[in-house]
Amino acid sequence: GSVGKKLAEHLANDGAKVFISDIDKSKLEKIDNPNIYCIDDAFSFDCDVFSPCALGAIFNKSSIKSLNCKIIAGGANNQLQDSSIANDLHDRGIIYIPDILINSGGAIGLTKDLMKRNEVETESDLMNIAYRVRKGLTESQEKSTSLQDAIKELIV
């Protein structure tokens, strides 16, 4: 999708090795970047970060068994089939950064345009996302809970 494409391009242009998969294989044929590689099965691929950016509800009790990543951080909405999956991922040592945090940057960008907010205010709000992720990760470790549970208090 368009979100995944932009993310892959940014990461690859910064020198990261990016491995991508898409249901629509014709989209993969159009990729022309030496740091982007096409793979068939993203779920079992050994990687640092798995970034689902299109379909929701892709993580369920069955699909997470084959995951071979350290972090899940993607722009797809509602990636978990149900909220208990966040705890299952946590139990497996996989950090799941909830889509509500990741996608909040888009909402902040919209408010900048719609409400005529200045760059300083917008940048401050964007930095607050990173702060909340770090704070949530700390609380998640301290309370031995998923990041999704830890951030519930931080979102309000």
Positions of PLM-derived features:
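A generic "binding-loop/recognition-motif" signal
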Residues: D24, L55-G56
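Short glycine-/small-residue-rich Rossmann-like dinucleotide-binding loops
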Residues: S51-L55, A76-N77
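Glycine-rich phosphate/diphosphate-binding loop of Rossmann-like nucleotide-binding domains
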Residues: G1-V49
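Short glycine/serine/threonine-rich phosphate/pyrophosphate-binding segments
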Residues: S2-L7, L28, I58-S62, L80-D82, ...
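Well-formed, non-transmembrane alpha-helical positions, independent of function
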Residues: H10, K30, S63-S66, D88
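Rossmann-fold NAD(P) dinucleotide-binding segment
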Residues: D40-C47, G56-A73, S84
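Metal-centered catalytic cores of metalloenzymes
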Residues: A8, K17, Y37-C38, S62, ...
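Adenosine-phosphate binding glycine-rich loop
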Residues: K70-V156
